[in-house]
Structure formats: C-alpha cells, structure tokens
C-alpha cells in the first residue's frame, strides 16, 4: 500500500524535528546517538520558501517549558544539523514479551540542514515512542504487505494508536493547508506569539483557496482576521459531545477531523483549560466515504460509533447543512501587526468563499475522481524544493511488473509502502507488542485499515491508497472505430443523444445553469484537477494486459508509469528537481493520455505509438461539439449576433487548418493529443497557445505551432538555420529537433472541427446571417475537408473499455477528396477578412512582419446605405459594418432616411430597432473630414429618434460617445454601434452607485498597509523596492508625506502590480462585488456576460485572467511633468474598461487647479470637457490619449523614426509600443498628425467615468491628480480580429516581455463561441417557420 501526500507541502510548521545547535561543538563521528540532539516542534515560520536563506522558524523544545520557545535561523551559523520527520519505514525492535527482534513501523527523519555527516546512520522514531534512534540505513526497509501490517496493528494497540494519530494529523494538516471549504465554521486553536499564552481559540469564518489563508473570528484577538497555516501553527478542534446521545437516528456523516500532537503538548494544552477528549484505542472504527465539498475527490472518514473514537464525526441533518450554506461571512480583511515576525512575508491575497457547503455522502469514488494518476514515487534530489518525500528508496525498475503496484509522487509527505513478498510474514504469529491478551473485539476492530480493503475508499485530497481491488473507471479507448458505421457526422451522433426539440417553438432553448457563486472565480492552474487511477493499479486488468499484449493509454507521468522508457520533457525536469512548482506532475506530463503502451512477451512495458484522431470517446468529443445542453447564458439573438461577427473568422480558421493538414506528408500518421483539463498546450518555441494542429517530438514531447514549424523548415531550406527568430530546444541527449522527425498532431478529436465548419455555413444560410468568408464564394475552388489518416496497422482493441468509442464519423458531404494546393486561390474580390487567409499562407519573420501587419490592417469601405433596405435577417458582420466618412452634407440625412418610401415599405415592427441601429451607426461616421478641425459644439440628438431612451452626449469633436446613465438597460444597443467602429466610449456617473467607503485610500492603508510592495517612479521609471503599501497611501493625498529622492524632492509614484495574485476577487472580495454589481454594460464586462466571448471558454480549459486589476498612482501636476506619463503608450490584446473609483486632490501644492487646466488644454481636450471641470465642478482624474487600432502601424513607424533621430536602437525582438517606453507629449502628437495624419481621442477621465478601450487601440494615461482606477478586460465579438493580430505580434517579443506569452487563447475563444452559438441556433431551428 502507498500513502502519499501529493501536494508540494514544503511546510515546516507543525512538523517535529531534531537538531544540533551550537558554535564550537566537539563531536565523536562514531557516536552519533550521543551528540547533543534537541527535539521539538516547529510552531511558526517567517517565509513559505524553505530555500530562502533568511528563513527563521519559531520552535518549542520537548525538554523545555513552552515559555522558552525561540526563533532560530534555519540556515544560520548556530544550526549544525536539522532533521524533520519524513516517512514511514520498518526497523528491527526487540519485543518486551519474548525478546525476539521484530520489524516495527517507525518514522524516519530527513536531513534538511547538514553541516556534519551522519555516515551510514539514519535517524528514526518508533511509533508511540518519544526517543529517537540512529540505525544503519541497511536495517531500515520500506513498508510492504498491507494485510500483515493491518493484523500487526490490530494486535499492537500502541502502534495502532500512534498510527491513527499520524494519519489524523496528516489529514488535518492537508485540510488546513489546502484551505478546503468544508472546514468553514470549525473551531481551531491558533498558536499565540504572545508571551502570556500558548494557544488561543478561534473559528474559521472563510477560506481563501488561492493563497490558502484562513479568515477567522477570534474573541481574544478581535483585530486578527486572517492567518496563514503555512506560517503559523493551527490545529482543528473537534467536539464529540453530541455523540453521547445514542437515541439519535443515523444521519449522513459530516466530515470532521482532529489535530494530533504529542502527549506532552496535550498536557500543556490541558493546563490552560483546553482539554481534549480521551481516546480509547479498543473502540471499533469503521470508515465511510463522501465527496469533498468541492466535489473533486473522495475522503475517508470514520462512521461515528461512540464518543471516544478518534475519528468520530458529528452527524448533521440536511437542514443543518443548509444553514451552513446560507451563512453570510464577513469579507473584511486585515493583517494583524501583533504577529510580528511570524507573519513576515504573509500577504492576504486570496478570496473568501461565500457559501460553506457540506459534502454529501458517497459510497464509491467517481469514475474520474482519483486525485492523481497512480505511478511510482520519485525521490527528490537535492535540487528539488520538496522537503518531504513519499518513498524511502528510489528503484529504477518497471513499477508495474507485479500485480499490485505502488503509487507515489515527487512531492509526497510520505508513508511510502510497496507490495512485494511479505515482509511481515513473521508478524502473524508474533505476540502482542503490549503483552496483553487478544481482546474479543480485536479481530473486529479494523480501525484505519478497514479502508484499505474497501474498493471505494480514497483518502483525503493529497492521499492515495493502493489496494488489491479497484472500482471500475473510465479509460481512453484505443480500439478502431467500426467500419460499418452509418454515414453520420460526429456532431449528428451526439445530437441524437443530447439535443431535443424545444417544446415551445417561440422560446429559445437555454440550458439550466448550475448553482455557482454569483461571480465565477478565475480558475487557477490545474485547480482541483482529478483523474482516475491508472489501469495498471488494477491487478486483474494488469494481468490481462500482460497476457494479451494489448495497447493502453499512458495514464500517469513517465516517471511513475514507465521510468525505463523515453521520458517527456516535463518528467525529465521533474526527475531532476528543476521543474516549476506544480500540484500534479502527471497532469503536466507531455505523454499523459497521449502515448500508448503495451507489454511484450517478456512482460516488459514498451511504447506502442500514440493515439490517433479516431480513438476518441464521448467525453472527449462532447467538449468540441455544439450541444445546446452544454450552453449557458446565451439567448437566440445574442447567438445570431456573435455568429454574424465572428463566423467569418472561424471559417478562415478552419480553412487554415485544412490547408496545413493537406500539406502534411501523407506517409506520416497524424496523432491525437487529448485536451487535458487544467493544462494549456503551448508552443515550446514562441509560447503561443496551440489550438489544434502542431508538431510533436515522439521522444520527448517537444511541441511547436504551425507558424514555428513553417519558419523552421524555411530557414533550413534557405540555409539560414542560425538566424531563425525562435530557437528550438534540444531533444534527449542533446540531439537537435529536425522538422522531418516531428509528427503532426491535432487536439480536436476526429473531424469535429470540419463538421462544425460545415454546420456554421448551413446555420448561417438558414437564419439569413450574412457571410463574407472565402468558402462561401462560388468562384473559389472548394477545399474539402482532409480525411483523417488511419493507422497503417489497426490497433488491438483495448480490454474492457468502460465506454465504447463512437463510430468513426463519415462526414464527407462533398465529393471525394481532391488534391489541395498549399495556398488557396485568390478570390475575385478581396474580402475584409482576408487577414486570416494571408496569415495562414505567409511566413512571418522579422524582416516582413511590419509590412504584413500594415498591409492587412487597411480600412475597407462598405456598400452604400441602400443596403439597409435589404431584409434585416441578413445581419451585418464586423468587417462589413466599418463605415468610412463621406464628404456629403449630412444635414437632413436622418430625416430623409426615415421618410424614404423604401424604408417604409420594407420595415415592419420587428425590424425597426435593427434599422435604427444601422442608421445610428452610419450617422456616427457620416461626417465630412473637414469637420475634424471644428471646435466641439455638441450634437443634440434626441434619444427618441434613436429608438432608445438612452441619455448621452458627444465629446472630441462629436467623435466620442458619452453615456450618462450607467444603469440604463439600452446602453449596450447604442454602445455597440460605436464600438464596432473601433471607437472608445465613456460611461459616466458610476461613482454614485459605488460604496465610496471601500475605495478610500484610508481603507486600503488600514487593511494592507503592512504589505511590502514595489513602487515605480513615474518620472524616471525606476523601481523602488523595500517600501510598503502604507508608504504609498500615506502620500496619496499629502505631498509632504511622500517618499523623497536623493535630492529631497517628493517622488510621483505608482503601485506596481498591486494587489498581487491572479484574481482581484481573491484579495478584495467586497470591492470585487461592489464593482461587478455596478460596472456598466455588464453584457460585455462581466465574466459571465453574454457578449464577453471569454465566458464561452469551457471550464475544462485554463481561462484567461481578465481582471479586475487596480491602477494606483499619484498625479503629475507640474509643467515639467507633462512630458511624462503615468502609463506610457501601449496596447492590450483584449478590450478593456477602466473605471475611476477615487480621485484624491493632494494638499501641500499651490495653483493646482490652474496647472490642471493648462495640462488639459495642452492635451488637446475639447471645450465640453473643460466645461465639465470648470462649470460642473467634476473631479478630473486622468488625461487619456487613445488612437485607433488601424493606426497602430503608423504610430510604430513614427516612433522608430523618432528613436533613430535620438540615437536609440530598435532591436528586432522589441517594439516601441509593446515596450511601453514612449509617452507622446504635445510635440510628438502634433508631429504624428502632420506627418502621418493620425489623430486620436483626447479624453479626460473624471471621477466615476468608465473609459472603454477597444482591443489593439494604442493608448496612454497621464494622471492629473492621485487616482485609484480599476480595469476589467473582456473579449467582444466586434474586436476579435484585433485580438488575433496582437497575439501574432506578441510572438516576436522577447521572452522577458510581459506580453510575450499568449494567455488569451483567441483561437480557442473563437471556436467555442461559434460552437455555442450554432448549438443555440440549431436547437431553435423549429421556430424558423413561426417567424
């Protein structure tokens, strides 16, 4: 059996240790046991990183009173040796009853700091003893043979009790360190740093899963709100008093657990009236399983039988569970000062969980619910950051040649136990260690080991037990699809099973959304990802595979499954301790659920190739199919709008994939890399997210995208291999990766991508959605979908698959495959969406990328307004809706258009709103170019004429829409007509709805003032380290309190990357809710907004982090500061809205108002903007300059020219815009307008204004006063094109650039947005006849 802890629990707090302290120690090398060892327990730590050279630990020694506790520097000069408890082993010990040496369980200690050599000796402590011994490593053996060990524990109560204490301690520590939701409401004891007390009591009010901190309520220390179990010792407290009532009916068990401490610690706690219930080891303990609160794994607990059982749990009714779920938890957060060094390095940066859910009982594990794939535990080398290991000794042999294999993990705490011929054979007849006669209840009292023989038992998250029988589980099928399958596409096959016709044809089919927190949390990497146990851990299936030699899919890491075979890159790095910290090494294995294995005739595990595209199962294919049952928060109208805007983009994506597939060598078998939950496939060369087709090395799993593969082949053919833009990593033993040795691999199973492409065309035709894609042009030679290459030799069916694979879909509705050219024919007329086609057939490199970007971002004209007379079902696409300004006089245009007879004849009640939208959109851009030079007069447009009751006005020479009511339900209709033109938009008045107390500087200073933070000097861009958040907030509105430079001048600072962490919601829950409840245009801006395409990405994938993010900075007021920017010119890959939540006017500076007015005027703001400041007394916060995305290349060339004039270099892997190294002052903006004709929008953002910035639009910010801004990113259907282009641009940035890595996954977003849209449209096809 194997008990391992999968988390990288490199945590010292709560662990027992033994050490040598002193400076001048005279030690006898042969008398290790006589050295002055001191043992104790670690109570607190200053840092989480054990390798930090400055880490200090707060310890209590066993032979001293707790009042003498002290801090010691772990790597200081006085610490000569430091050993911590490591894992469970067996060692010889003489039985007191008959003086016969027997092997007994013991805890071995691992050397963490070793300045002296122990030689061949190792430190261990027998379970139940306090003394530590030093024995030869040869006498220590790993634990084997579960059954005999179980019997040994039953007959020896001392070991039984100690082992249960050890297990319970590990369970409690795991729950606390993982911050599981089902500990909310539980009482705890927290170690006190106050000299007057050792412990104090508290209650867990909330958990923060990201930083794994606990929010607590404490009567003794009311100011203490947040603690981190990794830095301060925390133990769970359990109450078993209610179990005395034997008349209570059996109820579903509620998981509880209790911390274990040594007996002397318990006594100390009892002296402070903190008594712990007594424990009777003779009491029978039975085990049940239930699903964790997050539903991710199963947990072993005890079924309550009596009051004195160690693992009894309080029974709760359903009503009790509902009450727990409905508790309202406080979101206030603060870091206490009283903890001193104990909390050094601890930042409260995680979210609170609103609801505490009680886990339901489960009698068997889920089919996909094991915590990690099983395999062999690897021993950590010195380079690894892991403190605790789960295996006593690493063996470089095939782990699964025996019927019962072991499991482990490189990050295991561990109790590594492996099955083999019995090591406990002599224990069955051995007398009881305690010398007592066998109790009558002895044989029945299986205690902890009852779980080992239960096939449905799995230990808490982080623990696994390898047993002789396992439940049935899902396996990847590798059998060939039947050749006689009916001619149906994979989409049609699933539709017959899932999609049903709506009962009401007039109502769109909408899937019921599961109950979730009101604001979905941005998922962390591999958060809660679980997979079934390895097939090799089932003895029966293992034996069958060995006998038959059938192929099966690798379902664990290379190190665990087959250490003697080729290891992938991740597993090789993982083996040598150089891999990044990750929760589950198997999930990140390149060959996980990808490579096939089989046993040869000698029983050795061998490679059997890789999965092919036709080897999918229902779960794999459903992720990629348009199934209405999987779609939430999407209505019929929104689906049509999304498809009208991004349908052509999707078609070009499919065309590009077809062309690449058709250009591959027909002799090469295409592999299928199954999408792995919680893992983002990325190119190893350019860090771009891989959508589908890519090339993989079969030896190490190295993978490159289509573009990098094409560039490499071109550089090799031209003899310029040393000059390629992206270097390739080397393979095993340092060999170079040659393109011809890589295998083509796809991620989308089967022909699902091409099937969805066919459905897009048919659905758009049925619903009258206009399309401009190449594949809809009759003059273009049709490009049929490529046939997925079958294996040369069919594979042997997999033994006993739990879910039969779907029949190989026959989706060829077109003629037989024909030869497809490597580049598509040029259409008769250029399409506005030719950008993606050009991209797919053009090799982008350093020399031609600038010209490529410029040539494909040209402004395309539109048909005349006569097209508005067409049926409204022919929806406008993004490309076809871009309108160019006309030179005709627009006087009376709106009235004439409304009174036209054609419009009256063809307009009905349904189509009027859409027609008015188009009229409004055309009106925005239908002005003479000469009007740009006029001073702003405002455009008095009556809302009634627009068809919407939407208060608004115009700024920036009538080029900038400003919506005045953030709560107006019609805002998004008006907004999108300007938004689709690529124009920024302002929404004002948001501050009136916000809770102003939450956004004041005082509240931030009070809650987070002690946190360390990096500050940036806005004048010099220098980073100031060692400061605190409080230092920044103290000078926010007081110039005299600001930090000074070397000359004694107050610096203009901004907080860099604060608050830290991936999710704003984790750190500031109450502010997050306040913002999300009041953010304008929630259809676009909320995480689940129906027009936010990022919401369409399934939770199966790693969703992009789109904010919110805070931007806090002082104002630049002086005339000299006008050449500096708070945020220099840059652009973002996604759309964004930036809300001004607070404006602070600092005291201590004269003539601020006059300087602000001059700065606004110097920034080219219009008269209406100045009027808002002077007459309406609004608070101006920041001056923005935003430029159109189509002008990006002109600005780039202009800045390069200016850089050359100033003698600066322009490295090829850097970009003047992406580097954020320029601020365009008045002089540069005038040159840009005169030399390139580029004019942007000068916007002054007042308090409560939300500025919407389109994706790809260059912009810069200059704070006028001290500002607190919060930005939220989103992906709108109108700007997907720019998102994609920016992703391509970012590929060429240096690897140190913050924007280099592709986190948005535009192709995945496009695919799943289209997939969901057509699912809704197909489900509503029955309603077409009713329209």
Swiss-Prot record:
User: Per the annotation, how and in what number is the cofactor bound?
Assistant: Binds 1 Fe(2+) ion per subunit.
Main localization category: cytoplasm
Check the record and name the PROSITE patterns matching this protein. Answer: JMJC (PS51184)
SUPFAM superfamilies, from UniProt?
Clavaminate synthase-like (SSF51197)
Annotated residues that bind Fe cation are located at 1130, 1132, 1259
Q: Which GO terms describe its biological process?
A: regulation of transcription by RNA polymerase II
Show the catalytic activity. Answer: N(6),N(6)-dimethyl-L-lysyl(9)-[histone H3] + 2 2-oxoglutarate + 2 O2 = L-lysyl(9)-[histone H3] + 2 formaldehyde + 2 succinate + 2 CO2
Keywords assigned by UniProt? Chromatin regulator, Cytoplasm, Dioxygenase, Iron, Metal-binding, Nucleus, Oxidoreductase, Transcription, Transcription regulation, Zinc, Zinc-finger
GO CC: one term?
cytoplasm
The Basic and acidic residues compositionally biased stretches are 266-280
Required cofactor names: Fe(2+)
Task: Please name the GO terms that the record assigns under molecular function.
Answer: chromatin DNA binding; histone H3K9 demethylase activity; histone H3K9me/H3K9me2 demethylase activity; transcription coregulator activity; zinc ion binding
Where is the protein found, in the record's own terms? Cytoplasm; Nucleus
Top-level taxonomic group: Eukaryota
Where in this chain does the record put each JmjC domain?
A: 1086-1291
ZnF region ranges: C6-type: 683-708
Q: What is known of its domains?
A: The JmjC domain and the C6-type zinc-finger are required for the demethylation activity.
Quote the function comment for this protein. Answer: Histone demethylase that specifically demethylates 'Lys-9' of histone H3, thereby playing a central role in histone code. Preferentially demethylates mono- and dimethylated H3 'Lys-9' residue, with a preference for dimethylated residue, while it has weak or no activity on trimethylated H3 'Lys-9'. Demethylation of Lys residue generates formaldehyde and succinate.
Protein name, per record: Lysine-specific demethylase 3A-A
Q: What organism is the protein native to?
A: Xenopus laevis
Its organism's taxonomic lineage begins at: Eukaryota, Metazoa, Chordata, Craniata, Vertebrata
